[in-house]
Amino acid sequence: MRYLFVGDTHGPTDLGKLRSPEVAALKLGARDAIIHCGDFGAPWRQDMDEVLGFWRQVPAKVLICLGNHENYGWIMRQPVTRRYGCQGYDLGGKLFAPLPGQTATLGGRRFWFYPGGFSIDFFLRQTGVDLFGDELLTGEQAAAVMADYFRRQVPDYIISHDAPRSFILKHFGFPIRLPPDAYYAHTGERTGSRAHPAFTLDPIYLARRYNKWYFGHHHKDYEAENLRCLYRQMVLEDSLTGETRIISPAG
């Protein structure tokens, strides 16, 4: 089985990499899977659009780790079903978004999903239209997910949208901070009620309790310490041959 790991596509904005000749040449089919690291962004501001139609026609399985630029108002109305040994949202076609902390099994490999991200541009967005409090788990949800993670065997892959805070500070030099009070005033949420994923995921990184880790959100292509940030580049892995390839669309 082949897995194509993909970073942010933001609806149509960064979808070109999936429509590139380099991806077409892979001839991904029903036995393959695309693992999307979030900011899927389809549909956007409505219940159906051309981008969602594109994704629903993809022949490969598509598993989405939801980000912050998502239409949560629509997503959370979709049916929750069981697929690949875990619970998630059925988004139509072969699109599936695992719930937080769920582990999907594909081709004998185990993928643990932690969705969500903080929209630093929240003040430019309209709550309930292109900004949703559900982009972040509640503190209680995050604590339960993490407690469950540390009780279980380490998965083959962690798939998240954001990355551990300590990793980002060390490698990108960016000191991630908690959402400010203004964020909660803007979203109508209780101050401090939501968990920033970079802080939540940090204990996993600091304990080195992971094998491979893919994430997006930071709009970089970068790899260190078995963590890889995806944006323009994609990664193809083959579970049978063990081959790993970097897919870099031209232009």
What label would you give each PLM region?
Residues 9-10, 40-41, 68-71, 117-118, ...:
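Catalytic metal-binding/acid-base residues of hydrolase active sites
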Residues 61-65, 84-90, 167-251:
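Conserved beta-sheet core of the metallophosphoesterase superfamily
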